[in-house]
């Protein structure tokens, strides 16, 4: 079923109910009474039929299922939510952290009480959504979020144990690391020293990765091995705190605020747990324990009866900040004089800028070269080339946003099916010499599931949400044009983070590319690996696997379906 959907009925959103192959549990029907097969009663005291238990699909079912193409939002909303965050905070007294006498170290209190350390990471796209909603800059939105999660007027004010998040970090920090490592991956692939097949496809979008794993396994060797900024931040937090403070990863609870519901699915991947970086091979503790969206952040405030719009738009006092236990990583995560909150240039887009940085990183290594842009068939398809000063094309790359465009890319990368006839040509080889895929000669492709990129994620605050419609005059509902204008406002808020005149602490390095120093990033990552005693590759890279579902089927049924498909030329 999924193959039919992906080829013919693909849309930018397919709810789980359309293609889910895990059927709702069928309970045995109640046996009719032998005495009264049919009964009509007007007696109001008659017993009501017993309530059936609600049907549920667990996250495990979702991860093991190949029925859905993408967008597991409806299933995951109930599993990772603002209610779960509050439940965790109110479950036990938290571990208390205090500054040491020197002001750079950390002392721990309350280990024996069974509590946890709470850490939050916030994406720039979520800050932009909040900023557009409340008419503030992206930077001010970040301060408001920090006050909500850590400040005295935030969620701790009405909490059972007055627990709050000890650190609120910006995922732009790990985004910069991902940009540098991603660019290095591209260059390594061109030199033949990278195991990922060309073209390398970005893998920071979980909706796209989920789709590839479940319906197009032939593209998995092309996926970038880099972790996403969310995943990399989770690994950095769990490894460093567990090593430095001498506590187990399960006592560090990390929530991420993201623009996308599919990020909940990413956080649940078995490849992103402590079992991977510890190498235990057992079922591990997640690097990111929970993900809430921009919408759910406001629900978090409402649940504590906090008026988000009245939260301070200034930073928390420096005296309230607990230093991260490692001074080098503390400077990396909380830079005092670096443009860490910059979301990149407008040309980089609002999805992190992987492609933009890789192009300029490559161009910086070829003196006199320039980056040229070629617009595609729509706004979400763009081709790029790096051209030498003599006119030679050094590198080709592209941007594909939205599943309709992604489907075209995937189709071009699909290898020809071998013919079953002796001596026959591969099926579809008329335009595929030697039966090879006719994929474009791209070196790198930035792929995102959402049209318009991450600021248009499914978890963002929309123009027709009550908090926005309450401001509109009349009863008219916002239409597509209003949604387009709203997305433009969110994008504008996203790039308002660039309005910083603070100088970079790495400006004295001579290798800056788009304001980021690759040598500084590499030195910091090397320090992280040394501090934790773990191999850097195990910390920053991940893996992918084809998802073949047995959910709702027994082995005999599956074998018969495959046999029939082979007989009729299904090519499964």
UniProtKB/Swiss-Prot annotation:
Renumbered residue ranges of the record's region Disordered: 416-436
Keyword Iron: yes
GO molecular function, one term: iron-sulfur cluster binding
InterPro entries: Cytosolic_Fe-S_CAF (IPR050340), Fe_hydrogenase (IPR009016), Fe_hydrogenase_lsu_C (IPR004108)
Annotated positions binding [4Fe-4S] cluster 1: 20, 62, 65, 68
GO biological process: iron-sulfur cluster assembly
Amino-acid positions noted as binding [4Fe-4S] cluster 2 in the UniProt annotation, renumbered to this chain: 205, 260, 450, 454
One Pfam family this sequence matches: Fe_hyd_lg_C
Keywords noted in UniProt: 4Fe-4S, Iron, Iron-sulfur, Metal-binding
Family, as annotated: Belongs to the NARF family.
Function: Component of the cytosolic Fe/S protein assembly machinery. Required for maturation of extramitochondrial Fe/S proteins. May play a role in the transfer of pre-assembled Fe/S clusters to target apoproteins.
Protein name per UniProt: Cytosolic Fe-S cluster assembly factor NAR1
Top-level taxonomy: Eukaryota, Fungi, Dikarya, Ascomycota, Pezizomycotina
Gene name as annotated: NAR1
């Amino acid at each position: 079923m999924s193959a039919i959907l992906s080829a013919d009925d693909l849309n930018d959103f397919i709810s789980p109910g359309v293609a889910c192959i895990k059927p709702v549990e069928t309970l045995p029907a109640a046996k009719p009474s032998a005495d009264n097969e049919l009964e009509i009663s007007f007696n109001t005291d008659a017993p009501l039929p017993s309530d059936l238990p609600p049907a549920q699909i667990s996250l495990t079912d979702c991860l093991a299922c190949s029925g859905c193409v993408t967008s597991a939002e409806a299933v995951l909303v109930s599993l990772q939510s603002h209610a779960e965050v509050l439940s965790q905070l109110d479950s036990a007294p938290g571990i208390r952290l205090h500054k040491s006498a020197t002001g750079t170290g950390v002392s721990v209190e309350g280990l024996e009480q069974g509590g946890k350390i709470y850490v939050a990471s916030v994406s720039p796209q979520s800050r932009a959504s909040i900023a557009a909603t409340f008419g503030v800059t992206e930077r001010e939105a970040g301060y408001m979020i920090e006050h909500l999660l850590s400040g005295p007027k935030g969620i701790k004010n009405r909490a059972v144990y007055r627990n709050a998040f000890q650190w609120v970090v910006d995922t732009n920090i790990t985004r910069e690391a991902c940009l540098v490592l991603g660019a290095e991956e591209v260059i390594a692939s061109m030199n033949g020293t990278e195991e990922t097949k060309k073209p390398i496809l970005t893998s920071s979008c979980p909706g796209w990765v989920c789709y590839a794993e479940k319906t197009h396994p032939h593209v998995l060797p092309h996926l970038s091995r880099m972790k996403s900024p969310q995943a990399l931040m989770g690994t950095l937090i769990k490894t460093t705190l567990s090593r430095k403070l001498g506590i187990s990863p399960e006592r560090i609870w990390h929530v991420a605020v993201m623009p996308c519901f599919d990020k909940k699915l990413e956080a649940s991947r078995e490849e992103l747990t402590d079992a991977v970086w510890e190498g235990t091979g057992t079922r591990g503790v997640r690097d990111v324990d929970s993900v809430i969206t921009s919408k759910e952040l406001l629900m978090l405030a409402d649940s504590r009866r906090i008026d988000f719009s009245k939260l301070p738009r200034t930073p928390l006092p420096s005296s309230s900040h607990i230093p991260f236990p490692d001074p080098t990583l503390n400077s990396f995560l909380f830079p005092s004089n670096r443009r860490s909150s910059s979301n990149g240039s407008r040309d980089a887009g609002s999805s992190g800028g992987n492609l933009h940085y890789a192009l300029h990183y490559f161009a910086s290594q070829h003196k006199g070269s320039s980056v040229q842009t070629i617009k595609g068939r729509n706004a979400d398809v763009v081709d790029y080339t790096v051209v030498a000063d003599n006119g030679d094309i050094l590198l080709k790359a592209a941007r594909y946003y939205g599943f309709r465009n992604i489907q075209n890319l995937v189709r071009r990368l699909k290898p020809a099916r071998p013919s079953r006839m002796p001596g026959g040509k591969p099926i579809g080889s008329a335009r595929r010499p030697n039966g090879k895929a006719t994929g474009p000669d791209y070196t790198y492709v930035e792929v995102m599931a959402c049209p318009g990129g991450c600021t248009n994620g499914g978890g963002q605050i929309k123009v027709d949400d009550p908090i926005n419609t309450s401001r509109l005059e009349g009863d008219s509902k916002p239409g597509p044009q209003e949604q387009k204008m709203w997305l433009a406002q969110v994008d504008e808020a996203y790039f308002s983070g660039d309005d910083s005149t603070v100088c970079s602490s790495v400006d004295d390095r001579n290798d800056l590319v788009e304001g980021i120093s690759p040598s500084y990033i590499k030195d910091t990552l090397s320090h992280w690996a040394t501090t934790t005693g773990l191999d850097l590759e195990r910390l920053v890279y991940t893996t992918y696997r084809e998802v073949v579902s047995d959910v709702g089927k027994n082995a005999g049924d599956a074998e018969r379906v495959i046999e029939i498909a082979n007989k009729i030329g299904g090519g499964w």
